[in-house]
Amino acid sequence: MQTIDFEKFSQYSKPGPRYTSYPTAVEFKENFNEESLKTAFFNHDHLKNPMPLSLYTHLPFCRSACYFCACSVIYTSLEEKKVRYISYLKKELALLKNAMDTNREVVQFHYGGGTPTFFSPIQLDEITQSIQEVFPNFSQDIEMSCEIDPRHFTKEHMQTLFDRGFNRLSFGVQDFDFEVQKAIHRIQPFEMVQESVKLARDYGIKSINFDLIYGLPNQTKEGFLKTLEWVLKLDPDRLAVFNYAHVPWVKKTMRKIDETLLPSPRDKLEILEALISFLEKAHYQMIGMDHFAKSDNELYLALQKAELRRNFQGYTTKKFTQTIGIGVTSIGEGSDYYTQNYKDLHHYEKALDLGHLPVERGVALSQEDVLRKEVIMHMMSNLKLDYSKIEEKFSVDFKAHFKKELEKLKPYEEAGLLVFNPKGFEMTKTGGMLVRNMAMEFDAYLRGGEKHFSKTL
């Protein structure tokens, strides 16, 4: 990786989407409603070759707030809230069964949160069984994954997940430095994570991911490299290393972070450069903009073939799936739509009580949206683009259709961050750190100066 000129590189730090979707969630509107979703379900069920399903279930509860967290969570210690939520998940599942063909093949299954393991093992088993009864056609090689908070993870949880077929776990680690953990209100010693990982390995979990975050309060380059040394002792298969997005105008809990303790933009860049170098020496390869995987991992192998895809659950080797969002605030995705359930629990429950799918908003994609989505997702996943793949799928002349966008990429080429070739273009290793910036050049919705997004660096 080329040495970063921090003064020049800082010019690229500006608000921008992470592109877990295109159009981004900012463009979701309330005129996409229950009827819109039912129509989308019907259309997808009746495709010549219906795509497989990915099921995402949101389990929103946490016992206490982690100040850095941007997820949609509900803080509680009340058992009755969890029991009530399970009853409403069952109501939603019953409505989904009537609204779509739930016998289609399921290739991905994911629990996100919140803290999924804040639910008891018996409750998790009940939820999983309820979903499997409605969506019974699980693929033989299904990816079943769950987010794990090591502070709420027992042998009984692991046994339940194992019995239900889970084969991938993602542990929220963030940082092992105690001063950082204290500043973000999440204390979990190395030994706690070590014990959780050992438990997962003992049960034969084949894929273990760690979520790490750089840019947190009290973090330094030296301190984060020490965290990475501890990480290597636990030998995860994959790492997601996220850039902390400090958006206190969006997430109120972030207001509890002392902003004077946050690393400067230059410090964050130094941490990023150091962590990429450290992980590559440890034989973890960079995947997309924020993931790393071992050289023999399926993610890296798919990257070599430019076959990676990106969705709300991260990077995947699966071909395009229709994602069904279950639970409060969950997001669903099809080939030409996105939908999101109510973010407010009261409104979510009220819709279900009235017998309605709890759709709050969404967006139907135009053909131009679908085209640009394909371009952006290829860039975000593979850090390069082959024009012919887009031209064959959409019957367009790429250079003519995206003449203005390609012109906007020229400065990246001049800065040594992007290389054009006869087939398309490819980002350099350093340029890959700016994939969000380059993808933004193809975003037809950006208006400039918006505060909806975190900074790209």
Predicted regions: what they are:
Residues 432-457:
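Short, amphipathic alpha-helical interaction segments positioned at domain boundaries
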Residues 1-53, 102:
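Flexible, acidic/Gly-rich N-terminal and inter-domain linker regions that tether
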Residues 52, 76-99, 106-396, 456:
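C-terminal scaffold of the Radical SAM
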Residues 69, 374-376, 438:
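Short alpha-helical scaffolding segments that buttress acidic/His motifs in well-ordered protein cores
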Residues 57-73:
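Local cysteine-cluster metal-coordination motifs and their immediate loop/turn environment
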Residues 397-411:
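Short amphipathic alpha-helical interaction segments
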Residues 424-428:
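Minor-groove-contacting beta-hairpin "wing" of winged helix-turn-helix DNA-binding domains
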Residues 413-423:
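A short, conserved structural fragment
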